[in-house]
């Protein structure tokens, strides 16, 4: 590999690393993991300085600038994929059943989730409203389980800002 191609590849890879760490650090900061975010920012800055100095020292080659820019975009995607895998934090899942079903909360509790339920009125009559707080890593699995029980359920999830008190199930059954 000649020196020019080596620099292009190095800039590309280093910028992917930099932006991946940057993206994860930003998400850690937003989730309140301040010490982990601070530690990752140290590595982020070291990698950033290396990547930027490589580009600035070799500005005469447009391929270096393109490698930097493309590496940046790829780094954002990689960082988001990593964050999806880590799935930090909790979500609140609100479920409105298609029909009133008193047994539905118990079926979901039997799967290992904590459920609060109440009667709701919809256009076509009574429904059941459920609120479930769970770890984000369980979101897709919970959606599938709810749909298996009530295929017509309306499901919405959101991230709570703070959590205090309440009833917690220790672990969702695999």
Curated annotation (Swiss-Prot):
InterPro entries assigned to the protein according to its UniProt record, in alphabetical order: DUF2179, DUF5698, UPF0316
Cell location: Cell membrane
Stored Pfam families: DUF2179 (PF10035), DUF5698 (PF18955)
Keyword field: Cell membrane, Membrane, Transmembrane, Transmembrane helix
Primary location recorded for the protein, binned into one broad class: membrane
Protein family membership: Belongs to the UPF0316 family.
This protein's name: UPF0316 protein lwe1794
Source species of the chain: Listeria welshimeri serovar 6b (strain ATCC 35897 / DSM 20650 / CCUG 15529 / CIP 8149 / NCTC 11857 / SLCC 5334 / V8)
Gene Ontology terms: cellular component: plasma membrane
Keyword Transmembrane helix found: yes
Residue stretches spanning the membrane: 4-24, 36-56, 62-82
CDD domains: YitT_C_like_1
Membrane topology: Multi-pass membrane protein
């Amino acid at each position: 590999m000649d020196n020019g191609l080596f620099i292009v590849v190095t800039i590309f890879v280093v910028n992917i690393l930099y932006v991946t760490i940057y993206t994860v650090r930003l998400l850690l900061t937003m989730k309140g993991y301040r010490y982990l975010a601070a530690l990752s920012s140290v590595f982020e800055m070291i990698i950033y300085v290396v990547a930027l100095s490589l580009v600035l020292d070799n500005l005469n080659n447009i391929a270096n600038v393109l490698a930097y820019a493309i590496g940046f975009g790829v780094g954002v995607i990689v960082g988001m994929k990593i964050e999806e895998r880590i799935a930090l934090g909790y979500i609140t899942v609100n479920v409105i059943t298609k029909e009133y079903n008193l047994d539905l909360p118990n079926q979901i509790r039997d799967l290992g989730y904590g459920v609060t339920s109440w009667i709701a009125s919809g256009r076509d009559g009574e429904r059941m409203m459920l609120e479930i707080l769970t770890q984000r890593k369980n979101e897709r699995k919970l959606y599938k389980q709810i749909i298996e029980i009530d295929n017509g359920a309306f499901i919405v999830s959101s991230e709570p800002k703070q959590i205090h008190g309440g009833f917690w199930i220790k672990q969702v059954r695999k």
